[in-house]
Every structure is written in structure tokens, then in C-alpha cells.
């Protein structure tokens, strides 16, 4: 892998991690079209670190508030809305952890293909469009209860299927439950923090045990590029959806999915 490849891949990861357009659908393009080799475990860990740093920094006030309330609820019996939301995020994380543990090998073996990604990109794009147009968008994240958190968590679990998009699935589920677009996005982004931590830790453990060589220059490129691009993406995404809704991302998903099908049919 060259510095140019590491920059492009980290840029793609950073820009697509938090948009409802599927990072896996985009990361397959360089290998499918340009023949680039797999970036390896070390680089995967690096871009996880970069995107995690971006979302934590952007929502630093919320993260500090939720963490403080979470521990206060354990040691002091805090029952504030922040403590409740923190526990709901924990609950929403459980389905993805269980589903990932049980289904990881099956997904890797049978579902990690360009055909699956093209299909899920279109199907879940249409689902996002329907929900965005027909659901009541009134509630914020603090009005969630354990049933809603679990439902959104199950949507996050489904997103282990390549092309679905973790943020796309969770935002779609939150919109269906009546969250405003901004609240759905915030809840999705806050939910991403424990998932990215767990996924990055798992990949880091695999890296340590694999003995894979580490190129510090490529890793630094990956961390910095994914951090900057993810931070910019979060900022402008929240501003865009308040004015235009999810339609631009639905259109993009449909174009991408059709484009992938067209490319695959010519091979």
C-alpha cells in the first residue's frame, strides 16, 4: 500500500463512516475497480482510531455529560435524563455485539460480495426514503425508552451486512420511531462510539496476535486523514439534514447501487 492509497482509503472511511451511504460499499470500489490490495489489520485499526476521535471530539460535551451521569447512576443512584440516555446507548449496543459474534464468519463467507453490497445499498436507501417521508419527526433522543433503544440496536445489528450502513440503519430506525432528523443522527453518532471502541479493540487484538508488520507512516496518514474527514462530515451532515432531509443521500445510494450493478454486469 502506498501513501496515496492510504490517504484515499482513510478519506473514504472518514467521509462515509457517519453518512447513511455505507462505508463498505465505497471501500470495495478501489479494490474492485483499481485492483488495490486489502489494507490490512493495522490500517483498519488506524482509521477506527481516527473516526472515533472525530465523533468524541465533536460531541465532547455530550460524551462528558453522559459518562458522568452513567457513573453517577451506578455509584450515586443518579436518575437524570443523561443517565437514562447513557444506559439506553449501552442497551442499544448489545444486539450488534451478539449478532457480530454469532454471525461474523457467516457474513464474511457468504455476504461480503459486491452483489450483496449493491443490493443492500439500493434496498436500504429506499427504506430510508420511505421512512423519512412518512414518519412523524417530533421526538428527541432524550424521549427514547428501552423498547426504542433496543429496536434501534437491532437495526444496528442488521448493519453488519455489507452495504447496509450502520448510520443508515440506525437513523432509519430512529426516524421510524418518530425522532427528528437531527435527534436520529445524534443518537446514531453517540451509539457509534462504543461500537467503534469494541471493533477497534477487536481488530487491535487480532493485529497483536497476527504479528502483521506495522508501517507507522501509513498508520499516521490513516489516523489523521480519517479524523479530519470524519469531523468535517459530521458537522456538515447535521446542518444539511435540517434543511434538506435524507433525500440527497437516498439519491446517492440509488445511483451508487445501480452503478455497482452496471459495473458488475460488465465484468
Swiss-Prot record:
GO terms for molecular function: undecaprenyl-diphosphatase activity. Its EC number is 3.6.1.27. It catalyses: di-trans,octa-cis-undecaprenyl diphosphate + H2O = di-trans,octa-cis-undecaprenyl phosphate + phosphate + H(+). It is a multi-pass membrane protein. One of its GO terms (biological process) is peptidoglycan biosynthetic process. Pfam families: BacA (PF02673). It is found in: Cell inner membrane. GO terms for cellular component: plasma membrane. The chain crosses the membrane at residues 1-21, 39-59, 83-103, 111-131, 149-169, 189-209, 218-238, 245-265. Keywords: Antibiotic resistance, Cell inner membrane, Cell membrane, Cell shape, Cell wall biogenesis/degradation, Hydrolase, Membrane, Peptidoglycan synthesis, Transmembrane, Transmembrane helix. Disulfide bonds: none annotated. Its main location: membrane. Catalyzes the dephosphorylation of undecaprenyl diphosphate (UPP). Confers resistance to bacitracin. NCBIfam families: PRK00281.2-4, undec_PP_bacA. Bacitracin is thought to be involved in the inhibition of peptidoglycan synthesis by sequestering undecaprenyl diphosphate, thereby reducing the pool of lipid carrier available. Belongs to the UppP family. This is Undecaprenyl-diphosphatase. It comes from Vibrio cholerae serotype O1 (strain ATCC 39315 / El Tor Inaba N16961).
Amino acid at each position: 500500500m502506498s501513501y496515496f492509497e492510504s490517504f484515499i482509503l482513510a478519506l473514504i472511511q472518514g467521509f462515509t463512516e457517519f453518512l447513511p451511504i455505507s462505508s463498505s460499499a465505497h471501500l470495495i470500489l478501489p479494490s474492485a475497480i483499481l485492483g488495490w490490495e486489502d489494507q490490512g489489520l493495522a490500517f483498519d485499526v488506524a482509521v477506527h482510531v481516527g473516526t472515533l476521535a472525530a465523533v468524541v471530539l465533536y460531541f465532547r460535551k455530550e460524551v462528558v455529560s453522559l459518562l458522568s451521569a452513567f457513573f453517577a447512576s451506578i455509584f450515586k443512584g443518579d436518575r437524570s435524563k443523561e443517565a437514562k440516555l447513557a444506559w439506553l446507548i449501552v442497551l442499544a449496543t448489545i444486539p450488534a455485539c451478539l449478532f457480530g459474534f454469532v454471525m461474523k464468519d457467516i457474513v464474511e463467507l457468504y455476504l461480503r460480495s459486491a452483489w450483496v453490497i449493491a443490493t443492500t445499498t439500493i434496498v436500504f436507501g429506499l427504506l430510508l426514503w420511505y421512512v423519512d417521508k412518512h414518519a412523524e419527526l417530533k421526538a428527541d433522543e432524550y424521549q427514547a425508552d428501552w423498547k426504542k433503544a433496543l429496536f434501534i440496536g437491532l437495526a444496528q445489528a442488521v448493519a453488519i451486512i455489507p452495504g447496509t450502513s450502520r448510520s443508515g440503519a440506525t437513523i432509519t430506525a430512529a426516524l421510524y420511531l418518530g425522532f427528528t432528523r437531527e435527534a436520529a443522527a445524534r443518537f446514531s453518532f453517540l451509539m457509534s462510539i462504543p461500537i467503534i471502541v469494541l471493533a477497534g479493540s477487536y481488530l487491535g487484538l487480532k493485529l497483536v496476535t497476527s504479528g502483521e508488520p506495522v508501517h507507522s507512516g501509513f498508520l499516521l496518514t490513516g489516523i489523521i486523514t480519517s479524523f479530519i474527514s470524519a469531523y468535517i462530515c459530521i458537522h456538515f451532515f447535521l446542518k444539511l439534514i435540517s434543511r434538506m432531509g435524507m433525500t440527497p443521500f437516498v439519491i446517492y445510494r440509488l445511483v451508487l447501487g445501480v452503478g455497482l450493478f452496471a459495473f458488475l454486469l460488465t465484468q
